[in-house]
Amino acid sequence: MRVLTQADIGFFLEEKPAAAIHFDAKWDATHRAVTRSAMADAEQVLAERANFGEVDCDSDPELAKSIPIINVPSVAYYRDGKLVGALIGANQDVRLHLERVLRGDPIR
């Protein structure tokens, strides 16, 4: 999982057909660990078809503001460089959501 900045997010989103970006903050250590684990599990299976990134909302607030998230942790899902949805909460099935994104189905 790559740590993203405003400077590299464009290439990151265009590099593969799908992407998941975990938005978090260091002060939310418990939820951060749970979501990172879900991201790592999904990355093991889908790394050839999807990119996995992370944004620390405190370190890069401008990038965090560019995505419609209202709380951390959140995961934003992209298809062909375009945002298709963002979900709040640590207990997400990132793999399932990315598989839906890759098929062209909506996430829920």
Task: Enumerate the predicted regions with their spans.
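Non-catalytic, surface beta->alpha helical segment in thiol-disulfide oxidoreductase systems
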Residues: 76-108
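The canonical Cys-X-X-Cys-His
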Residues: 28-31, 75
